[in-house]
A protein has these predicted regions:
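Bacterial N-terminal signal peptides
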Residues: 9-19
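Primary mode marks residue(s) on the alpha4-beta5-alpha5 output face of response regulator receiver
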Residues: 25-191
């Protein structure tokens, strides 16, 4: 559990530094004004996620509601990207997974500095899940099993379970794959 305080401190520090900067930018620099693509889904989970997160197409709404930048844009060497993860810390540490309440919103940085909502990630720390589910069950979100990520990991988190849902951007690898080849960190505006 030594890693958890370090992670919390890192996220808190990032939030203190990034949130004022993000709020100081004009709304046009902070989110895309393009309407989200009209889309129908064969997945009730994707439909639930879209309904629950539609207001966060504008990242300023997420910031106002307490979401904080948790990662820079995460990309893979040949697998596309995940994007920038914004976290709601009270959900991250509650040991619960709820289809209407993702722990992370995922945004793709755009060349003009805007952030475009592309998906969500459900995250539960393994120890928190185990304490509430001593039967050893694997966490699931609306019947979709999560992936286990052991520690140490690139995020500095203790072991956790996660499930990506690409509700706002088509993923050729599947709506629940970790990496999305349609998402890129290469298009972000120079810092």
């Amino acid at each position: 559990m030594k890693k958890l305080p370090q992670f919390v401190a890192a996220v808190a520090a990032a939030a203190l530094v990034a949130a004022p900067c993000a709020l100081a930018q004009t709304p046009s620099m902070q989110h895309s004004h393009d309407s989200p693509p009209a889309r129908t889904s064969n997945s009730p989970l994707i439909d639930k996620v879209r309904a629950a997160t539609a207001r966060f197409v504008d990242v300023n709404v997420a910031l106002h509601e307490g979401w904080v930048p948790g990662t820079p844009c995460v990309s893979g060497p040949d697998s596309g990207a995940m994007g920038v993860h914004y976290l709601l810390l009270r959900r991250l540490f509650d040991g619960v997974l709820n289809a209407d309440e993702p722990e992370s919103l995922i945004y793709e940085p755009m060349p003009n500095g805007a952030l475009r909502l592309v998906g969500v990630e459900f995250i539960v720390l393994a120890a928190d899940w185990a304490s509430k589910h001593p039967d050893g069950s694997t966490p699931a979100v609306d019947g979709h099993l999560t992936n286990y990520v052991d520690a140490p990991n690139r995020y500095g988190l203790p072991a956790f379970y996660e499930l990506h849902v690409w509700a706002w951007e088509h993923n050729p690898n599947g709506s629940f794959a970790d990496w999305n080849t349609q998402v890129s960190c290469d298009r972000q505006a120079p810092q």
